[in-house]
């Protein structure tokens, strides 16, 4: 990364970094951690660098402790190979799934598929059925769907994913039986995604009209979770093709477990997975603990997809702010409600542009000059793909996977159903297990909530929620009120966390103090966090983007990655690569010429080779840019050929920087006279 994004360093205002009570400079524990994990305090450490957290993750997974899994997922992310096991559990109990709310496309005004409007009468009722699709009901024909569901458009969009394969049926039939079987499995996977999208539209179609983003959400989910329970294949990514010509890779491939993993972590993951032998989302072993009973029913891919869409497209209920025609007061209302509730997609786009202009003024002005932001309301544009669809189609699968770890791990600390005594007891049991596993060292590894804020205490009564009348205040007062609301929400979560049936008042107070230091709950809405992640992503590439022309910028924004090599994308990659052209070329050439680097255990004899482009290119400004364009590092059976430990730290730095930008923005709004 080109900028220093570590907490407490850089050019941020000092008052923002002294407010986290758990951080003490110069402490013995910190010194020990810094010596053992030199990158921890440089915002570069991922969970795959921390064996302690990986072991803790496995413990929570064995007991199906969703509270612990969510904590690790949002704070440090998940090892890529573990997402297929953890994401289904997080999706079961996500607050946006248990209490879904989606704003109608008609209200957002960003749906460009006008044909769907005339089809609305034929779709399902406007009040969706709360029953869940049966896992046994994954097979079916087109006749089971209303004729208004655009199956042909869904299939057409799915074909875009395989455009780089360039294989037709005649070529496929000429291949070996093993390869033909893989293509048949690939076709079944696409049919499964197609049915998942169609069933979602059948259930929610009166609210959510068809959009290509729905298809790409399904494809993105299939890049981490096997869509077919009888197979362990996932999709390898939009930009990658396996050597045999498919878009598949085997989740049981040992190389997959070692991706971005050091030797210690690799042995931990492999030992854990050897207990389950071959992976299947329908073969997860259920623990004997009674509290896991609610997780006994396995979810089909269609059910997981529906829950994923509910999380990504979640929009809050209409806020209770005072309606006004004043642009100034409307801006203040948005500033107060967006961080706490997220807002509709149109509000989030407006908030993103506001933050972009204030936090990255030079790049924002350059984008305006190059007409990059024109037409952002069109659902085909990059801003919508980033903010509304959670990076589907636009971000690399590894960057998107880490961001989705945060989205799915988001929790406010409250029980899933505060009115259910059973749910409260389950929440308390999980919380007690989490607290029993957390010591000071583990807490340091997890760190505070990524979006902790400088609590504003002066002139604010944090014991009560702001009255609606207080919303029409100055911008500074609006921010104070908003931060007070965040503080109040956090205190409410702590009260739930520290209260247990059968504890006396003294024990409850002790638990409250312990939990304050132990559990870093989410403090801002996850879709608001996504806004700052988007700004941080742009900041990480700011200097390179300022050197590109509009067409190159748009190409990058629509196919973004924290580590990219193709063509002008080499300018966007980590600066270290600029001095390693010869070394990178040597690595690539040695790989292509080294037979021992080809794992042929399952590769059919007539497999199709994937050839990487290694030519140097010249960008539009006449600058020579090395383009190693690594071959399919996600191939079905081959070894990985890109530098494995750089990409995850790239997106980890982006997310850490997003928290810094959130604090910088809130500080600017508080101290500057706007």
From Swiss-Prot:
Ranges of residues in domain Rab-GAP TBC: 77-411
Entry GO terms, CC: cytoplasm
The entry's keywords: Cytoplasm
Annotated Polar residues bias: 1-14
Keyword Cytoplasm: yes
Top-level taxon of the source organism: Eukaryota
Residue ranges with Acidic residues bias: 104-121
PROSITE patterns to which the protein is assigned, alphabetical: TBC_RABGAP
Compositionally biased intervals (Low complexity): 125-138
Region (Disordered): 1-33, 102-149, 590-651
Gene3D superfamilies: Ypt/Rab-GAP domain of gyp1p, domain 3
Localization per Swiss-Prot or TrEMBL: Cytoplasm
Main subcellular localisation: cytoplasm
InterPro entries: Rab-GAP-TBC_dom (IPR000195), Rab-GAP_TBC_sf (IPR035969)
UniProt record similarity statement: Belongs to the OCA5 family.
Protein name: Oxidant-induced cell-cycle arrest protein 5
């Amino acid at each position: 990364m080109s900028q220093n994004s570590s907490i407490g360093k850089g050019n941020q205002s000092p008052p923002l970094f002294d407010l986290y009570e758990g951080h003490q400079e110069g402490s013995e524990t910190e010194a020990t951690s810094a010596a053992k994990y030199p990158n921890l305090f440089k915002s570069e450490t991922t969970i795959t660098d921390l064996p302690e957290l990986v072991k803790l993750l496995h413990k929570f997974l064995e007991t199906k402790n969703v509270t612990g899994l969510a904590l690790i997922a949002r704070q440090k992310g998940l090892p890529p190979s573990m997402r297929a096991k953890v994401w289904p559990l997080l999706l079961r109990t996500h607050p946006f799934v248990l209490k879904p709310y989606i704003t109608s496309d008609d209200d957002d005004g960003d749906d460009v598929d006008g044909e769907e409007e005339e089809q609305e009468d034929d779709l399902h009722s406007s009040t969706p059925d709360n029953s869940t699709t049966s896992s046994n009901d994954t097979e079916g024909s087109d006749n089971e769907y209303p004729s208004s569901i655009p199956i042909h458009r869904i299939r057409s969009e799915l074909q875009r994913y395989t455009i780089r394969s360039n294989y037709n049926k005649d070529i496929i039939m000429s291949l070996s039986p093993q390869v033909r079987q893989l293509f048949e499995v690939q076709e079944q996977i696409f049919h499964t995604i197609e049915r998942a999208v169609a069933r979602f539209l059948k259930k929610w179609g009166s609210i959510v009209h068809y959009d290509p983003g729905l298809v790409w959400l399904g494809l993105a989910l299939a890049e981490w979770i096997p869509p077919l329970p009888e197979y362990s294949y996932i999709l390898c990514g939009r930009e990658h093709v396996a050597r045999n010509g498919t878009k598949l890779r085997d989740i049981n491939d040992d190389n997959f477990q070692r991706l971005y993993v050091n030797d210690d972590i690799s042995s931990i993951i492999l030992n854990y997975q050897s207990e389950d032998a071959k992976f299947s989302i329908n073969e997860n072993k259920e623990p004997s603990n009674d509290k896991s009973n609610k997780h006994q029913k396995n979810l089909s891919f269609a059910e997981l997809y529906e829950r994923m869409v509910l999380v990504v497209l979640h929009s809050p209920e209409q806020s209770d702010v005072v309606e006004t025609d004043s642009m100034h007061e409307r801006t203040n209302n948005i500033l107060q409600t967006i961080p706490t509730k997220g807002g509709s997609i149109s509000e989030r786009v407006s908030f993103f542009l506001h933050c972009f202009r204030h936090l990255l003024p030079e790049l924002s002005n350059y984008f305006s000059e190059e007409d990059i932001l024109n037409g952002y309301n069109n659902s085909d544009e990059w801003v919508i793909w980033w903010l509304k669809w959670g990076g589907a189609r636009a971000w690399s699968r590894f960057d998107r996977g880490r961001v989705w770890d945060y989205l799915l791990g988001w929790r406010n600390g409250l029980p899933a159903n505060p009115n259910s005594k059973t749910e409260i007891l389950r929440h308390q049991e999980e919380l007690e297990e989490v607290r029993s596993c957390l010591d000071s060292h583990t807490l340091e590894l997890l760190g505070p909530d990524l979006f902790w804020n400088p609590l504003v205490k002066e002139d604010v009564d944090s014991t009560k929620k702001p009255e609606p009348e207080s919303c029409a205040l100055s911008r500074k007062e609006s921010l104070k009120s908003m931060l007070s609301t965040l503080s109040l929400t956090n205190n409410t979560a702590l009260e739930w966390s520290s209260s247990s049936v059968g504890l006396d008042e003294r024990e409850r107070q002790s638990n409250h103090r312990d939990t304050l230091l132990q559990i870093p709950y989410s403090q801002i809405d996850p879709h608001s966090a996504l806004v700052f992640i988007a700004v941080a992503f742009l900041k990480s590439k700011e200097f390179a983007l300022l050197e590109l022309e509009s067409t190159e910028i748009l190409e990058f924004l629509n196919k973004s990655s924290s580590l990219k090599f193709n063509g002008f994308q080499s300018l966007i990659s980590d600066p270290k690569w600029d001095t390693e052209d010869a070394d990178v070329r040597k690595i690539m050439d040695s790989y292509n010429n080294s037979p021992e680097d080809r794992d042929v255990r399952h590769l059919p004899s007539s497999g199709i080779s994937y050839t990487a482009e290694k030519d140097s290119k010249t960008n539009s400004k006449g600058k020579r840019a090395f383009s190693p364009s690594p071959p399919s590092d996600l191939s079905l059976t081959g070894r990985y050929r890109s530098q494995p430990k750089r990409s995850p730290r790239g997106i980890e730095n982006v997310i850490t920087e997003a928290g810094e930008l959130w604090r910088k923005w809130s500080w600017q709004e508080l101290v500057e006279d706007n």
